[in-house]
């Protein structure tokens, strides 16, 4: 009960903080994200592509998500490659570490940790964040970010709506046309691997 109460208090505090941050029509956290992108030389074009796909997919599976949940996913998408400045190898781990420890005005430590966890699970195995994935909101955010990263892996122009997703309770069904699949064999292969990863996870 104590942990639950603490979680509710943290959540309420973050909601109040977010409201205060946005009262003048601007959110200092947006400026913090832009500064981190500049500081860590993030590929802005790729960040926008991934953010666009992640936002589109998340709206389909979580239409009633809170504005904060949507924004957290977009911020994580915007910063998912910040660790490439350290190394291209395992950059998701470097990105997660940096976001979890960097000074980012406007963000609570708890919110930074959630976003760092999202970034860490953008690729690779899912077991590293079993506890986080037990939270449905986090699991759907993670799925949408991972799918967006896969969809944008070629780092070129994309059709955001070429890949659709349908939700059935806790299950997800990917929908795409045969022409798109034929023209994107590498992406199709990665999507099949992704489906297998979630299947092994029991999702």
Listing of model-derived features with the role each one plays in the protein:
Residues 18-39:
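Long, charged amphipathic helices and adjacent flexible linkers at domain junctions
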